[in-house]
Amino acid sequence: MTATPARRTSLASPATKPVAGGLALAFLATLAGGALLALALEAGGGGFDAAANFDTYLWRVARFTIWQAVASSLLSVLFAIPIARALYAEARFPGRGLILRLFAQPLALPALVAVLGVTSIYGRNGLIAHISDMLGHPMQPDIYGIAGILIAHIFFNMPLAVRLLLAAYESIPDDHWKLAAQLGMGSRARFRLIDWPVIRRSLPGMIGLVFMLCVTSFTTVLTLGGGPRATTLEVAIYQSLHFDFDPARAVALTFTQLALTLLILLILRLTGRPSEEGFTQTATPRRYGSPRKTERLFNIIVIALGFLYVALPIAGVVVSGLTADLVRLLSERIVWHAIATSLALGFSAALLAVFLSLALVAAREATRNARIANIFDTGASLILVMPPIVIGAGWFILLRHFTDPFVMAPLMVVTVNAAMAMPFAVRLLRPAWDTAASRHNKLCSQLGIKGFNRLRLIDWPSIRRPCGMAFAFAMALSLGDLGTIALFGSDALVTLPYLLLQRMGSYRTFDAAGLALILGVLCLALMMIADRAAASRKEAFLQ
């Protein structure tokens, strides 16, 4: 009697794929739910008045959190609009592709590295201060406080907004530009009739996305806040546990942060998401006609200013790092120990993230029920509701009732970083998996190829490059993480970001600059590997 082949088999049998996806969702639910449960139990049975912690300090911190996020979002998008418009108009601008690649780097850089780059340009001993001294107008800019936070957030988010706007520009039909050229429209008329309608549709989702990134910004505010007046909710959570060890205060702050995050995600869902094509946008747009000389000059100036704003802090990291005593730094055992620890934790987190993401993607493809498939599809993204510092705070409070939380530090760092990388890994893996499944499912079913044989012979060649991309991206995110390690780090567990923060705290600025260069090179190398894998995958697809 001939066995009937399974209709869908790829990573494993059809019955086990939804089970594997369910286990991946259970991992995320346990991580987030355990933190929430710990916070709820602490609030309900901790022997303190929960309402008393919702005092003027908490509301002041919450107001500053919202204020700095609103200001950062509006300024980032405001500066991004003319830069994106200029880059789109100057389709043949020399180095346009290089600028777009440069604009992808701030998100790849660990926040701590970028902060050091910003201080090397705008700090009291930075480039601007040196230039003003040379011109005979000495100044000592104060980078710490709201000014430094805004400068750093614009550095991170303005390039992101530019790339998202360029993706929106790609949706404009060629006929619109052709008609504008035939009618002899000026720059203002083109902006009012063609550019602005597209920009206006993208603004709500784009501002919401940048606002979300700024609200959950931890490292930037921790290093550039400069005092109690410039403290956000996440930094206050860290301070209440790490310095004051006040779980009651941490619980109140965490619930406030969680409520704010949920509200932002709800607004994002109602306003819509910005297009994601801008993350890989490198195509040259088609334009009819050419800008006038004055408009072209303006475009070149705008592009140059945007380029300098992003390039100078990155160059500052390189220059400052090279001026450090790298030979002495690399001769220290603690530095190599931190590098090895970071690589080991990053490798483990990336491997776990890719494995769990594959389980979710396979379960979604194998499930016929649309609702269940949607749960598998969106399950990974829901973890973003809880910032890493919130998850870390919950588990820190829970673990202290059973064991020393610092003993569990490696496990917590790996699991939290893996969970935070999963939404991005799923987004990278899903298209390749679905394409391979649509091509091979029927043939494999007819030939009876299933289980490990299908994974080895059919699926793996199709998903190898996307897996490499997801692994490199997840490892880069984990290498630069400071949120979880800031709570669980100790002398027994030192990563590169944690060691860098320690050297900054002890005012060993040259050592910090050298460590920042090492960390930045590691993360950028991983992102370049992921980017090259993406390019190779695209070339193979076109062939």
UniProtKB/Swiss-Prot annotation:
Record-level GO BP terms: thiamine transport
Any one Gene Ontology molecular-function term assigned to this protein's record: transmembrane transporter activity
Domain ABC transmembrane type-1: 62-266, 339-530
Annotated keywords: Cell inner membrane, Cell membrane, Membrane, Repeat, Transmembrane, Transmembrane helix, Transport
Primary residence: membrane
Top-rank lineage group of the source organism: Bacteria
Signal peptide positions (record): none
Transmembrane annotation, as ranges: 19-39, 64-84, 102-122, 142-162, 205-225, 250-270, 300-320, 343-363, 379-399, 406-426, 468-488, 510-530
Bilayer disposition of the protein: Multi-pass membrane protein
GO cellular component term of the entry, any: plasma membrane
Subcellular compartments: Cell inner membrane
UniProt xrefs under Pfam families: BPD_transp_1
Quaternary context: The complex is composed of two ATP-binding proteins (ThiQ), two transmembrane proteins (ThiP) and a solute-binding protein (ThiB).
Function of the protein: Part of the ABC transporter complex ThiBPQ involved in thiamine import. Probably responsible for the translocation of the substrate across the membrane.
PANTHER family: MOLYBDENUM TRANSPORT SYSTEM PERMEASE PROTEIN MODB, THIAMINE TRANSPORT SYSTEM PERMEASE PROTEIN THIP
Similarity comment: Belongs to the binding-protein-dependent transport system permease family. CysTW subfamily.
Name the UniProt record assigns to this protein: Thiamine transport system permease protein ThiP
